[in-house]
Design a protein with these regions (language model features):
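Soluble non-cytosolic domains of exported or imported proteins
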Residues: 20, 24, 113-122, 182-185, ...
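Bacterial Sec-dependent signal peptides at the C-terminal "C-region" and cleavage site
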Residues: 3-18
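N-terminal mature-domain "stem" immediately C-terminal to a signal peptide or N-terminal signal-anchor/transmembrane
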Residues: 14-80, 105, 220, 388-389, ...
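Active-site scaffold of zinc-dependent metalloenzymes
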Residues: 70-117, 123, 127
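Active-site-proximal alpha-helical
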Residues: 204-234, 243-312
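Non-catalytic terminal regions of proteins
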Residues: 24-35, 260, 270-272, 281-465
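Active-site recognition of the HExxH zinc-binding catalytic motif
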Residues: 121-134, 221
């Protein structure tokens, strides 16, 4: 591959030529490998088709791989196809999957010390996040992402959990260096025993956080490692030393998984995720990738299946399913759930069809919270929709409402609906500053800023920020 130096004749200010050359060379390798061996990185993955924004801090933003007219503000670069330059760089930019002019785009923040191998990997990592975002679907783990807010409550001061995590890193490092499938299999089973024991103590919410972080950032980092691995096999790859350094750094990271206390614990899964992927490669080749997506697995689940870790559990479950005819039980459950859905919808229709004023409360730009519920009288109607059959207290900043009547809560639309009594019993008071007060024997509502409108029997209150 011929290294292309950028001609910046059309640009008032540009990145240093050496940085430009490194970026363009790295991107050329991503395009080449994506076109030739994209499926070897991940099934259906074509990083060569995803445009990339390279943010060069203090210099500007380099756009490569763009198809069509350049986005506003970008100038073409002579000698580099499908490229553009913007002579400004967002100081707050991070490497991530993003969107530019309506197109899914990878974004990479560049520093002067990054090698070609590092940029090939990082570009692929961020391009994979674009794929994950496109694949996101309700009920599917792949593309879902983890609840990052849980880093605020993760037990970093728990020595038992920290020791267990450190042990996992050592086992994974040994598995990566192990010769032969039998040794890798033994170490994989040891890892699973340590991981599942630690997760039982950690609790289901944080265990799920770790597993989803490994699917999200861990798999993206696996594609980073994998693409550099594939690049280094090519004789003309210009940065084999960088590829070796990357592998050594990954192994060192596993051996010191909990040592760098200055960094967020979320970065641990950038180490365990690719290590699990490489271990699965060594155990069963590429087949695990499609299986992980098709069967909605975590990396941990995929590894357990690959080494038969839960063979006895599976055999006993199948025996019970055969003995007690799981197909009949599932059919009955399907029928029961369908009936429950119909019943809940009928309950909602009945509640809202009651005579009187139907009050609709909506909140824009913030979450409609609950300050009080009666759990004994709360029913799920469908995902995100609840029926409070007796009493509920809602709140959102300077808005508060107490209902002594059935209320339908739609958490997706941030909306409450309830019939709050006959017209003659409902008193609405509004103030010059947008204050609203609604009183009836069934509701007491106050808001500092809201719009009120009436359409027939429907009284709508839109709470403002």
């Amino acid at each position: 591959m011929v290294t292309v130096a950028l001609s910046l004749a059309l640009i008032v200010q540009g990145p240093p030529p050496e940085t430009s050359t490194t970026i363009v060379t790295a991107h050329q390798w991503v395009v080449r490998l994506g076109a030739e061996v994209g499926d070897s990185i991940w099934p259906g993955f074509r990083p060569d088709t995803i445009p990339v924004l390279y943010v060069v801090r203090g210099q500007g933003t380099l756009l490569l791989g763009w198809r069509g007219a350049l986005p506003e503000g970008f100038l073409p670069i002579a000698g580099v196809d499908r490229s553009g330059w913007l002579s400004s760089a967002d100081r707050g930019a991070a490497s991530t999957g993003t969107e530019l002019a309506g197109h899914p785009t990878a974004q990479v923040v560049v520093n002067d010390s990054q090698s070609v191998a590092a940029l090939v990997g990082l570009t692929t990592h961020e391009a994979f996040h674009v794929v994950e975002a496109a694949a996101k679907k309700e009920g599917r783990r792949f593309g879902q992402g983890e609840n990052s807010f849980l880093v605020t409550s993760y037990p970093v001061f728990d020595p038992q959990n920290e020791a267990g995590m450190a042990l996992e890193g050592r086992v994974l490092a040994a598995a990566e260096e192990a010769d032969g499938r039998a040794r890798k299999r033994t170490l994989a089973r040891q890892f699973l025993a340590v991981r599942e024991s630690r997760h039982r103590a950690l609790g289901p919410e944080l265990a799920q956080f770790e597993q989803l972080a490994e699917l999200n950032e861990g798999l993206a980092e696996y594609t980073l490692v994998r693409v550099v691995q594939l690049a280094a096999r090519r004789r003309d790859f210009p940065d084999r030393p960088g590829a070796v350094r990357l592998r050594q750094a990954k192994l060192a990271g596993l051996r010191t998984l909990t040592a760098n206390v200055r960094l967020s614990i979320r970065l641990r899964y950038y180490a365990t995720g690719p290590a699990l992927g490489l271990l699965l490669d060594g155990l069963e080749g590429p087949a695990w990738k499609a299986r992980l997506m098709n069967e909605n697995l975590t990396l941990q689940d995929a590894l357990a299946d690959a080494v038969g870790y839960r063979t006895q559990e599976v055999a006993l479950r199948r025996q019970a399913e055969s003995t007690f005819v799981i197909a009949r039980l599932r059919s009955a459950a399907d029928s029961g759930v369908a009936g429950l859905r119909a019943l809940r919808r009928a309950q909602v229709d009945s509640v809202l069809a009651a005579p009187g004023v139907q009050l609709v409360v909506t909140v824009a730009g913030r979450y409609l919270g609950l300050c009080g519920i009666d759990p004994q009288n709360l029913l799920q109607v469908e995902p995100g929709v609840l029926l409070h059959t007796r009493w509920v207290q809602a709140c959102a900043g300077d808005f508060q409402a107490t209902f002594n009547t059935p209320v339908v809560q739609d958490r997706n639309a941030q909306m409450l609906r309830a019939v709050v009594g006959a017209d003659s019993t409902v008193k609405v008071t509004t103030g010059a500053q947008g204050e609203v007060q609604i009183e009836s024997p069934l509701v007491s509502l106050r808001a500092a800023q809201a719009d009120v409108s009436r359409d027939g029997r429907v009284l709508t209150v839109k709470i403002k920020n």
